[in-house]
């Protein structure tokens, strides 16, 4: 899955925005202001996703393309290599999981006001 496809998929999820919070090359995707995915436009061979801590470890054990994210809390963030053997559908499921992990931490009233964010299962 290339970076354009990843970007398009992230932006297709409800209420997602993109910005450059750190510098002019680090692209972040947010739901309600909270980051769930990031990539460096100067090194588009990888991107990072939030993950449930237990699942993060399992994924790293099973897939060489998935490692702890550099410069992030490795307990919660995985780095995904885009040039490995992971299928597009699997990468999309990881993106949905990341989105869902962030949505779970949002205040309950946000889900009531924007129920579309609760429809994404990861």
What annotation goes with each model-predicted range?
Residues 1-122:
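Charge-dense, helix-prone N-terminal extensions
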């Amino acid at each position: 899955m290339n970076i354009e496809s990843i970007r398009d998929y992230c932006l297709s999820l409800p209420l997602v925005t993109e910005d450059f919070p750190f510098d002019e090359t680090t692209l972040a995707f947010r739901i309600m202001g909270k980051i769930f995915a990031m990539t460096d436009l100067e090194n588009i061979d990888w991107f990072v996703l939030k993950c449930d801590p237990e699942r993060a470890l399992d994924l790293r054990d099973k897939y060489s393309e998935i490692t702890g994210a550099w410069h992030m809390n490795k307990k919660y963030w995985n780095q995904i290599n885009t040039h490995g053997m992971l299928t597009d559908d699997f990468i999309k499921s990881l993106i949905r999981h990341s989105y869902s992990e962030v949505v779970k931490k949002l205040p309950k009233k946000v889900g009531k006001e924007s129920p579309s964010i609760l429809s994404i299962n990861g």
